[in-house]
């Protein structure tokens, strides 16, 4: 009877609200399964964490166009176990020299859409800088999976289809996006269809062979500048060629005996995080128990 009761019990009394996933050797977490698999394979063949991050970054440029594209920017924190040193690289996109703050004050739409708001992309420079200084495998080896994925195609997810439908109004304003992501009936890429990007494959291949210069100088840089200037933007070839990813001093604090390191300015999130932790340290969170207020902290 007790065995039957255990099987039919509908409420399981977990001992913790957290359910961590544990890996014995390494772990890769991304927003797309193709990118996760690529990062896993890089680590499996002996690459380090930076190798995997770079490979994943370029893979996301293929499979997560709304957020992982080569036209974006970001920040990266790198911890070296041997030296216990944390390095931080700022590769945030930069405003073109000709852009002025007053251009974006009066019109809310101008702040969000169109070529005027495009900044000089930093992702390629940042990922390549991280690889050059901290990677172990060759760049062609890291980018080969993304080159093949863009050339041979991948299965369109429900997520990608939904995002293209959700953003259709603004996406259709751009002819390149219109031709790339929508059919003649202006319907977005169909779920489970195979999406191929031969031009992106060639772009990543050029980066793999010639590094940063392939993207920020020459044919690709000229295309980006021409596209921007002919559509009301300000990005020039000079803006592209002068872009550099930079090392920044990371921010450090302590929290209940732990050393917390995060990205410093120009990123703002890290500063807010550390300030929040410093405030929370003054409260006994364990004593408050499980309640709505604690969950929403």
Please give the residue ranges for each predicted region.
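Conserved small/polar residues in nucleotide/adenosyl-binding loops
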Residues: 295-297
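Metal- or metallocofactor-binding catalytic centers and their adjacent structured scaffolds
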Residues: 291
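Noncatalytic scaffold domains of N-terminal-nucleophile
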Residues: 4-37, 41, 49-210, 215-217, ...
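Extended active-site and interfacial segments that coordinate phosphate-rich ligands
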Residues: 280-281
